Structure formats: C-alpha cells, structure tokens
From Swiss-Prot:
5-phospho-alpha-D-ribose 1-diphosphate binds at residues 79, 104, 131-139, 200. It comes from Rhodococcus jostii (strain RHA1). Allosterically activated by GTP. This is Uracil phosphoribosyltransferase. Pathway: Pyrimidine metabolism; UMP biosynthesis via salvage pathway; UMP from uracil: step 1/1.
Length: 209
C-alpha cells in the first residue's frame, strides 16, 4: 500500500478550516488555496534531489546546494488544479507545467480525458500531480495512468483534501504514488463529494455553479 502524508502544520490547518466555511467568498477561497498549496510545497519537495555549485559571496568563494527546478513538472488536473498551481510555482518558479483535462461523467463518476499537454523529455523529470480534491479517485487514477505512459522518473500526488475512498482507489491502482494532503475527511456522499469537505472546489475557486 502506498503512503499518505498528512501535512498538519498549524498554518495549513488554520487556512483549511477557513476554506471550509460556507460563507467564504470566492476571493478568500482562492487566496487560501494559493497559500495552502505554497505551504504544502515545502513538505512535498522535502526529498527533491539537489546539486552542489560554486558561489561567490561578497567575502569569498564557497559552495552551496540548489535544486534543478527545470527537472520538476507540476501537472495540473483541469480545471480545479489551476487553483493551487500558482501557490506551488511561487515556491519553485523554475518548474515546468503540464495540464491534463479530465471531467467526471455525472452518471458513472468515471474520468473522461479531453486535453493532455506536457513538457518534453518527461522521462528525465519528476512529476507532481495537483488537484484540490481526491474524492472518488477516478480522475487521479486516470491522470497517473496517462502520465506513466510517458515514463517520468517519479510521480507524487498533491491535494488539499481527500477521504478514505479516494486514497484506497489511487493506491489500489498506483501503490507507488505517494499522496500529500492537508486532511483525510470522513467519507464520500452518494454524489461523490467529500464529507465534511469544502464543497465543489472548482466552483468555489472560479465563482461558478
């Protein structure tokens, strides 16, 4: 079984609680999503490879460690994934960005792909798939399956919120993909929404219904 990393930092939990509020405005919800995703990036990339380089300070030459942001790809699952993309790019502005367009069939709850665009040479890159919610897991499973066809070095999945059903679905299909989240909520309802959840993340991010 794959691993689930719940990021319990007080700032992350505080902001998630503010996002849960029914009366949070679109502006507030969007800002909080951006802030949480930026904070989570520190933990998600804790084990990212580094390389040593020479540096000249104002006083002398020394060495330091840096990451190669160009080898990192944030893959946003459209459309809601774009709502947490900017926060992560704030921390790693040199990262490349890919997009997977998936929508949930309202009858089967299955994922249907309508768009796929990735940077070249994905075989040389580490991929972080992002989506605010890991609910039924169908979109996540489909996205990871599609990405594996491109042969990236590694894949991680990042979401603000998930539930036992979503975790089980992704790890059953892809036990090698770790999940990073701010919380694991109680369950799904009959419509495939997380309870207690934050509502429809895409609608709340973009002010649509």
């Amino acid at each position: 079984m794959g691993t689930v990393h719940v990021i319990e930092h007080p700032l992350v939990q505080h902001k998630l609680t503010m996002m849960r509020r029914k009366d949070a405005s679109t502006n507030s919800f969007r800002r909080l999503a951006n802030e949480i995703s930026a904070l989570m990036t520190y933990e998600v990339l804790r084990d990212i490879p580094m390389q040593e380089i020479d540096v000249e300070t104002p006083l002398e030459f020394t060495t330091g460690k840096v990451i190669d942001g160009k080898k990192l790809v944030f893959v946003s699952i459209l459309r809601a994934g774009t709502g947490i993309l900017d926060g992560m790019l704030t921390i790693v502005p040199g990262a490349r960005v890919g997009h997977i367009g998936l929508y949930r069939d309202p009858k089967t709850l299955g994922a249907v792909e309508y768009y796929f665009k990735m940077p070249g040479d994905l075989q040389e890159r580490d991929v972080v798939v992002i989506d605010p919610m890991l609910a039924t897991g169908n979109s996540a499973v489909a996205a990871v399956e599609r990405l594996k066809e491109c042969g990236p070095k590694s894949i991680k999945f990042v979401c603000l919120l998930t539930c036992p059903e979503g975790v089980a679905a992704l790890h059953k299909a892809h036990p090698d993909v770790p999940i990073y989240t701010a919380a694991v909520d109680r369950q799904l309802d009959e419509h495939g929404y997380i309870l207690p959840g934050i509502g429809d993340a895409g609608d709340r991010l973009f002010g649509t219904k």
